[in-house]
A protein has these predicted regions:
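Alpha-helical transmembrane bundles and membrane-interface segments of multipass inner-membrane proteins
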Residues: 1-171
Length: 171
């Protein structure tokens, strides 16, 4: 868990101190880029709005970490649930990484107060970029991009939980 938080924070601090907001470098062709963006809200840039919305989101994240921690302790003592301990621990590490951004980055980087920091995102994988045909039933002639979200190490830590859930369910 500590490794995920450390890698997450080191990568964010590097991007924050070596890139300009919006700066992008191509790592592998056009499909893997480092693109510096900051997220004011949560997944996919969804915001609760205003000063109190940001505070609510930050306190929700902190409460979620407490609940997830308690959940991990309970799962650790149940042999049927132990296979979920590692994935949930990675989720916990990811949540802690994003909480650090939300609580401290506003003050550390001098752009806002405590609990109003923005989450640093940098990994961008636009695997498919095309224009939809004019006769396409929805969004005819519009630009289409898959995979559009920009994310960070903390965000990526959720993937093992999804994989473990699929493996157990036999999907």
């Amino acid at each position: 868990m500590l490794a995920v938080v450390l890698i997450d924070q080191l990568s964010k601090l590097y991007i924050k101190t070596h890139f300009f907001l919006g700066e992008e470098i191509h790592v592998m062709g056009n499909w893997f880029r480092l693109h510096f963006t900051e997220n004011y809200g949560m997944a996919f840039g969804i915001e609760l709005g205003g000063e109190y919305g940001k505070l609510l989101l930050t306190f929700f994240r902190i409460a979620a970490v407490g609940v997830i921690g308690w959940f991990i302790v309970k799962m650790s003592s149940d042999s049927l649930q132990q296979k979920f301990v590692l994935p949930w621990t990675l989720i916990l590490a990811g949540a802690i990484g994003n909480i650090i951004d939300s609580v401290f980055y506003g003050v550390w980087f001098g752009y806002d107060t405590w609990f109003h920091g923005r989450v640093v995102d940098m990994f961008y994988f636009p695997l498919i970029q095309t224009t939809l045909p004019e006769n396409f039933p929805i969004w005819p002639g519009e630009e289409f991009e898959f995979f559009r979200p920009v994310f960070n190490v903390a965000d990526a830590a959720i993937v093992p939980l999804l994989e473990a859930t699929e493996a157990v369910a036999g999907v």
